[in-house]
Curated annotation (Swiss-Prot):
Pathway: Polyester biosynthesis; polyhydroxyalkanoate biosynthesis. The lineage of its organism: Bacteria, Pseudomonadati, Pseudomonadota, Gammaproteobacteria, Pseudomonadales. It comes from the Bacteria. Keywords: Transferase. One of its GO terms (molecular function) is transferase activity. Catalyzes the transfer of the acyl moiety from in vitro synthesized 3-hydroxydecanoyl-CoA to acyl carrier protein. InterPro entries: AB_hydrolase_1 (IPR000073), AB_hydrolase_fold (IPR029058), Carboxylesterase_BioH (IPR050228). SUPFAM superfamilies: alpha/beta-Hydrolases (SSF53474). Residues 28-254 form the AB hydrolase-1 domain. It comes from Ectopseudomonas oleovorans (Pseudomonas oleovorans). The keyword Transferase applies. This is (R)-3-hydroxydecanoyl-ACP:CoA transacylase. Its EC number is 2.4.1.-. PANTHER family: HYDROLASE ALPHA/BETA FOLD FAMILY, PIMELOYL-[ACYL-CARRIER PROTEIN] METHYL ESTER ESTERASE.
């Protein structure tokens, strides 16, 4: 299962690497938004859960993954800017749904507050409107280690906290990935944490009141950092909010064990299953060999 690769130009400012997993029988397209320090590779299991029921789009932020070589890392990118990048991708791929993981939820809620045309439903996983004590400790220590560019501590911090329930093999992959990131990625994450601690989450929640589509919030019952109880407070901000709990799962949900993977897939498909609607033009890529450049 190989994606159709395109590097898209976003308003002449950023180049964004995208992978489009086409399913010929699918009528709906979903865009996946990853969390901090993550890349398109983090969504391998989620793609298997959603494809071929849906066309699936993955992308890397301009400062991360396969988008990095296409951008000059001259300035930090705010969550608001990430939201506008997402809006451009929604329009380009004519997406019906979006799904975010962890802190990708902040830019997703900011984007949905603009009520993008064509988006029918959203899934927000492992995210919370509350920065509780475990999460605050995680962010505070992360800020300290990122500022010092302490790769050993950053790698261990992720595995010892939000990744504590991952299988050992995934922890090794996690450590190798997180501890080998470029210094500008550490600086970008440091910037994001400060945004969150100062005002960014509050801004996302204020904007969430404008969201007019159904949003499903999924959390694991073993997740101490974005808890089931805290996530339910989204009902105060998102009018058409729905909630699902994945049993015996922590922050990383479908990556943690087979049962959690099956339950997460069942919950997602149950919420997103296509309904009868008017036919719409299906996305066709710009054909320029393996890589496409679209405005």
């Amino acid at each position: 299962m190989r994606p159709e690769i395109a590097v898209l130009d976003i308003q002449g400012q950023y180049r964004v690497y995208t992978g489009f997993y086409r399913a010929d029988a699918a009528e709906n397209t979903i865009i996946l938004i990853n969390g901090s320090l993550a890349t398109t590779a983090s969504f391998a299991q989620t793609v298997r859960n959603l494809h071929p029921q849906f066309n699936v789009v993955l992308f890397d932020q301009p400062y991360a993954g396969k988008s990095k070589p296409h951008n000059r890392q001259e300035r930090f990118i705010s969550k608001e800017t990430e939201a506008h990048i997402l809006l451009e991708l929604i329009e380009h791929f004519q997406a019906d749904h979006v799904m975010s993981f962890s802190w990708g939820g902040a830019s997703t809620l900011l984007a949905l507050a603009h009520q993008p045309r064509g988006v029918k439903k959203a899934v927000v996983s492992s995210f919370s409107p509350v920065i509780n004590e475990p999460m605050r400790d995680y962010l505070d220590r992360g800020c300290q280690y990122l500022a010092a560019c302490d790769r050993y501590q950053v790698g261990n911090l992720v595995n010892d906290t939000i990744g504590k329930h991952l299988p050992s093999l995934f922890k090794r992959f996690n450590y190798r990935h997180v501890s080998s990131l470029d210094s500008h990625e550490y600086a970008q994450m440091h910037f994001h944490i400060n945004e969150v601690l100062q005002h960014d989450l509050e801004r996302a929640l204020d904007g969430a009141r404008n969201i007019d589509i159904p949003v499903l919030f999924i959390n694991g019952d073993r997740d101490e950092y974005t808890t089931v109880e805290d996530a339910r407070q989204f009902s105060k901000h998102v009018g058409r909010s729905h909630f699902s709990v994945i049993r015996d799962a922590g922050h990383f949900l479908d990556m943690e064990n087979k049962t959690a993977c099956e339950d997460t897939r069942s919950v997602m498909l149950g919420f997103l299953k296509p309904t009868m609607r008017e036919p719409r033009h299906r996305y066709q890529p710009v054909k320029q060999g393996q890589h496409a450049l679209a405005i």
